[in-house]
């Protein structure tokens, strides 16, 4: 098996190409910062040149066949020969504000695990004072940890952080935290 050639296409060439050929509306990044922020999560990270059409499937080494992703997002990107799928994926995960992607993924993960949205959890408790929740979340941060080699909390850690925050809120207000956990595949709205 031959070793793949080093990619000669630069980050600047990729940004220049896509800033003229793709609308940044609905993406997690503005093209003015696309050279330093991941195009999926929007965080400032070391960027990797990610093939749109995989090299293993004949993807070319030219600006039109690359997007810029952080290592974590690069591992999760679609590896398929239809280039539209990459742009569908990027737009589906777009967030309107920088540095909110991971918390949003944690909120989605929370619903998957507990079968209820965070918004519904707050409404059920009639929470109007979010400062108290923020304060509890800050206290609970000491109970969290990154996986070795990762620089951020994963979505299940964030979902757990939300859960222990709500449990503490319930404890302080003499409320009972629901413990109904069903397998995701048995819920009606899945598949």
For the regions a protein language model found, what residue spans apply to each?
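C-terminal, charged low-complexity interaction regions
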Residues: 135-191
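Cys/His-rich microdomains that often coordinate metals
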Residues: 42-46, 77
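Short, charged surface segments at domain edges that flank catalytic/cofactor-binding sites
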Residues: 1-37, 59
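Short cysteine-rich clusters marking metal-coordination/redox-active sites
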Residues: 38-41, 70
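PEST-like low-complexity intrinsically disordered regions enriched in Ser/Thr/Pro and acidic residues
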Residues: 94-127
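Short beta-strand-alpha-helix junction that forms the catalytic/metal-binding core
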Residues: 59-77
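Short cysteine/histidine-rich metal-coordination sites, predominantly Zn2+-binding motifs
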Residues: 53-61, 84-94
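Histidine-centered catalytic micro-motifs used for acid/base chemistry in nuclease
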Residues: 48-52
């Amino acid at each position: 098996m031959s070793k793949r050639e080093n990619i000669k296409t630069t980050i600047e060439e990729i940004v220049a190409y896509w800033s003229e050929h793709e609308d940044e509306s609905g993406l997690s990044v503005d093209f003015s910062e696309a050279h330093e922020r991941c195009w999926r999560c929007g965080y400032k990270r070391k960027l990797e040149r990610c093939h749109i059409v995989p090299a293993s499937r004949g993807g070319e080494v030219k600006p039109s066949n690359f997007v810029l992703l952080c290592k974590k997002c690069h591992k999760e990107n679609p590896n398929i020969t239809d280039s539209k799928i990459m742009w569908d994926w990027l737009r589906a995960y777009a967030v309107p504000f920088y540095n909110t992607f991971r918390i949003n993924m944690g909120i989605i993960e929370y619903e998957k695990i507990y079968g209820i949205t965070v918004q519904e959890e707050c409404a059920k408790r009639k929470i109007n004072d979010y400062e108290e929740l923020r304060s509890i979340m800050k206290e609970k941060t000491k109970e969290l940890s990154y996986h070795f080699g990762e620089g951020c909390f994963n979505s299940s850690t964030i979902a757990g952080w939300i859960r222990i925050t709500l449990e503490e809120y319930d404890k302080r207000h003499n409320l009972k935290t629901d413990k109904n956990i069903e397998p995701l595949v048995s819920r009606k709205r899945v598949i």
